[in-house]
Swiss-Prot record:
Gene3D superfamilies named among the record's database cross-references: Exonuclease VII, small subunit
Compartments where located: Cytoplasm
A Gene Ontology BP annotation from the UniProt entry: DNA catabolic process
HAMAP family per UniProt: Exonuc_7_S
E.C. numbers: 3.1.11.6
Principal localisation: cytoplasm
A Gene Ontology term for the protein's cellular component: cytosol
Assigned protein family: Belongs to the XseB family.
Enzyme class: hydrolase
Name this polypeptide is given: Exodeoxyribonuclease 7 small subunit
InterPro entries membership: Exonuc_VII_S, Exonuc_VII_ssu_sf
Organism whose genome encodes this protein: Colwellia psychrerythraea (strain 34H / ATCC BAA-681) (Vibrio psychroerythus)
Described function: Bidirectionally degrades single-stranded DNA into large acid-insoluble oligonucleotides, which are then degraded further into small acid-soluble oligonucleotides.
Domain of life from the UniProt record: Bacteria
Length: 82
């Protein structure tokens, strides 16, 4: 699989590539240099996935029913925290 630029990867593509990298590293058949290159790519993919997940979380809308009227409200990630 040709490596796409990180910014062009979807969330699912980044997770799939990250999974492939983990499997390759766990096999232990790579040189140190190859392992370090994959490890660095994996870290970047992990960070990208986290950013994309946070962006999606911010866009989530919750359907609230107030006084019998449906209303869309932006997701508030701090609403359940004490």
């Amino acid at each position: 699989m040709a490596k796409k630029k990180l910014e062009n990867l979807s969330f699912e593509e980044s997770l799939n590539e990250l999974d492939t990298i983990v499997q390759s590293l766990e096999q232990g058949e790579l040189s140190l240099e190859e392992s370090m290159t994959l490890f660095e790519r994996g870290l970047n993919l992990s960070q990208l996935s986290q950013v994309k997940l946070q962006a999606a979380e911010q866009k989530v809308q919750i359907l609230l029913d107030k006084n019998g009227t449906a209303k869309l409200t932006d997701f508030d990630s701090s609403a359940g925290e004490s």
